[in-house]
């Protein structure tokens, strides 16, 4: 017999409630999208070229890669005339492990043609309110002793407002000193979504690898994130549809990666070519495991997956 321990069964048995809750959550999310006439799609998990991004490292699989997100293939479907699509899939990112991170995790992504990021914020809120309601939370939810009011409308603040409200320096100073992420994590994130969920939007242009810039202000991208109880749950944006600008951003990301001695990815040319027929659209990625953490009232992502990597 292999190294079998009763402890393994005991640890799994302790997760009965959390895994049941997780299954019900995924079913309620799927139900929302079916009711709203979305097509559920499946795209390959193993791909020849991920989107080059400065802070995300893909896991190699032979001479291809495991997807860090289904984004590129889903956008190719949008460009081919599929206007409302969603997918719940496994994604993989190298060197991501912690109480809130897994190297293999479950992501919900959806895209809507002729939507902008503000419309998508509204739809994200409606979807989550419906999912929480299906799970028995109509008024509020408690996570780590924080009582979070789920009543609509949820809080919406710009990144610049969040900096002026919570940070010791302005957003301009943070960008000049290359401290944006540091200040966001230390001072701002812990204050977001505390009494009610918070959408923080209008990110600096340099932090928007695949997002459209605002027509009225090219220093700002039409990007948003959702926080509940200080935990980042989702990231969405109005999609960039300009093929030349997207190629240039990918090249800049490749250079930033090279400076860190990270791999240079093949350019995802089929995705870039598809942008020529891409309608105006918006898309979002939401972490299912983190959402399950909130519903299970736990601070450890391991509690809501059957087998974290160390249990294999």
Would you name each region that the model predicts?
Residues 1-59, 286:
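TRNA-binding/sensing appendages of the translation machinery
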Residues 35-41, 133-142, 294:
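Surface-exposed helix-capping loop/turn segments at secondary-structure junctions
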Residues 35, 79, 130, 134, ...:
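Residues at alpha-helix termini
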Residues 133-172:
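Alpha-helical scaffold segments that mediate packing/assembly in large oligomeric complexes
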Residues 81-83, 137:
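Glycine-centered helix-coil hinge/cap
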Residues 15-24, 112-118, 142-158:
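Cytochrome P450
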Residues 28, 44-77, 84-119, 157-312:
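A translation/RNA-centric and nucleic-acid-associated enzymatic feature enriched
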Residues 121-131:
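Short amphipathic C-terminal alpha-helix that caps PH/PH-like domains
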